[in-house]
Amino acid sequence: MKIAVLFCFFLLIIFQTDFGKNEEIPRKQRRKIYHRRLRKSSTSHKHRSNRQLGIQQTTVFTPVARLPIVNFDYSMEEKFESFSSFPGVESSYNVLPGKKGHCLVKGITMYNKAVWSPEPCTTCLCSDGRVLCDETMCHPQRCPQTVIPEGECCPVCSATVSYSLLSGIALNDRNEFSGDSSEQREPTNLLHKQLPPPQVGMDRIVRKEALQSEEDEEVKEEDTEQKRETPESRNQGQLYSEGDSRGGDRKQRPGEERRLAHQQQRQGREEEEDEEEEGEEGEEDEEDEEDPVRGDMFRMPSRSPLPAPPRGTLRLPSGCSLSYRTISCINAMLTQIPPLTAPQITSLELTGNSIASIPDEAFNGLPNLERLDLSKNNITSSGIGPKAFKLLKKLMRLNMDGNNLIQIPSQLPSTLEELKVNENNLQAIDEESLSDLNQLVTLELEGNNLSEANVNPLAFKPLKSLAYLRLGKNKFRIIPQGLPGSIEELYLENNQIEEITEICFNHTRKINVIVLRYNKIEENRIAPLAWINQENLESIDLSYNKLYHVPSYLPKSLLHLVLLGNQIERIPGYVFGHMEPGLEYLYLSFNKLADDGMDRVSFYGAYHSLRELFLDHNDLKSIPPGIQEMKALHFLRLNNNKIRNILPEEICNAEEDDDSNLEHLHLENNYIKIREIPSYTFSCIRSYSSIVLKPQNIK
């Protein structure tokens, strides 16, 4: 019996010893374990959020696609309608040659499929010459307080960082948020130092609460130990304390000694925690510096969102408004350029005022202007100071349409990419007028008094990057000489051009579009070698000239040929036979084509490639031969002719079982008796709704 009792007592001692050792694990180690768990949980949460974000971004919605917009807090709130769901549009007579389908928006030419945002709430797309715009759809917020950030239209929670944070940063500091450089500059560091992230403060609070709870538990343990003491030990302690007090050597009790020791340990722990926090912050800063931002995107804040800086006040004249970085004073009845001091402004609109002069100091307070619109004013050449634009080192777009200029302003910034001086009274362009504009891409000089007599052949030589030149509504009789080799699109409509010589396009090997409508060109005044060797020329518009035949010696690379409103009576045989890959769009509306003006070889070389053929408003009495052999044809106009009968095999080939690619067939306003058309005449066309037969003329 005694052996069993001793054995149990021995086991009890071993158990208490092990339990005490487990309780005496250093608190510093426990804190490290606790912080390690916090880090693991935070990283796992980040991974989960990243996975969720990736899933949301790759999800495809049908039938209407939506493009999610990811905010700075990695939430997805705003959604835009996709432009891919817009239906196709039938061709019209207002054809812009070239496959690109450009759009003209506020005087700016947008290429096909270009996407831009004219306002913070709107996104637009150029689709085959049409401008399609969508407004942002804002999802409701479930937070108690919402705010609409500057430059945006959807409300966000007040604790969510907005784009206005970036709007308060100067343009020169924008690179710190992009992927162009892995080094961060001082403004970013200052931004983080001035507003410490809340997550660090939360970690400190959690640590202090954990330490406080540990100390409370220790105090409770001490109280329970004191309560467990026997009365004898209490009496002994009282006698001991009384003896000490009588002797004058007052000593502290064991509980007080423990408390003092705990206080010292607590101070040591706090010092160690401060050192650990400083080390952790240093490690986090190093991790932030080592984490490069890739891609052309804004850098996201590494911690919690930062509040937006206060907006500064800017005094504007009556009738003017401020939108993000644009000051708009359209039709504000201004007589002079207002004195403004706003380095953050990048766009200034002064359209439709009565401004007559531009002094040298007009834009001193707007050094970062990128776009300046001075159209529809009364500005004269003598009223522009010689240094008016000299300080605008970042100016890229200048619009001076609809003024009273007689010459191009001098000392324009070399950063200009677009210059518009349409509808003025320009009398000449000399060799120095466009000097130093080697970055200019677009030049528009329509509606002036320019001709080959007052335009120096060397005037366009400095324009090494020029791709888009508009010289319509002037007085040219020949193609201007000295065009730069970089030119891609040339517009010379509404002039008095009579001929096209062999040397006109000798140095313009990149030219893609030539528009010469509303001139006086005859087919025998087009030199055989004028453009036949052009390898990139795809679109030619010779509408409303004096052509009697489809011109020969057309470029091999031609895809679009627009010949509306001439007096064409015949399409010569094999005129398209040399083209590669082949003509795709041929517009011959409003001419004088008759049945004897076309035969089967007239379209030789284009049977495999022709997609649109316009033969409306002519003198045809029957379906032209070879239509059923045009396998790629999608759009055929034969309306407003004199057609009376449609033979069964003129549209569909009875020997072939495949459906035709025809999507639009116009036969209205002829003399066809619809009831007499055989039922299988249009059997190869997939949908009868694609055929327009009504109304018909009665005679």
UniProtKB/Swiss-Prot annotation:
Cleavable signal peptide: 1-20
InterPro entries for the chain: ECM2 (IPR043184), Leu-rich_rpt (IPR001611), Leu-rich_rpt_4 (IPR025875), Leu-rich_rpt_typical-subtyp (IPR003591), LRR_dom_sf (IPR032675), VWF_dom (IPR001007)
LRR repeat intervals: 368-388, 394-415, 416-436, 439-459, 465-484, 486-507, 510-530, 536-557, 558-578, 582-602, 609-630, 632-653, 661-684
Keyword entries, A-Z: Extracellular matrix, Glycoprotein, Leucine-rich repeat, Repeat, Secreted, Signal
All residue ranges annotated as the LRRNT domain in the record: 307-344
Composition bias type Basic and acidic residues, residue spans: 176-186, 243-260
One cellular-component annotation, GO: extracellular region
Family annotation (SUPFAM superfamilies): FnI-like domain, RNI-like
Domain annotation VWFC: ranges: 101-158
Family designation: Belongs to the small leucine-rich proteoglycan (SLRP) family. SLRP class I subfamily.
Function: Promotes matrix assembly and cell adhesiveness.
Name listed for the protein in its UniProt record: Extracellular matrix protein 2
Natural source organism: Homo sapiens (Human)
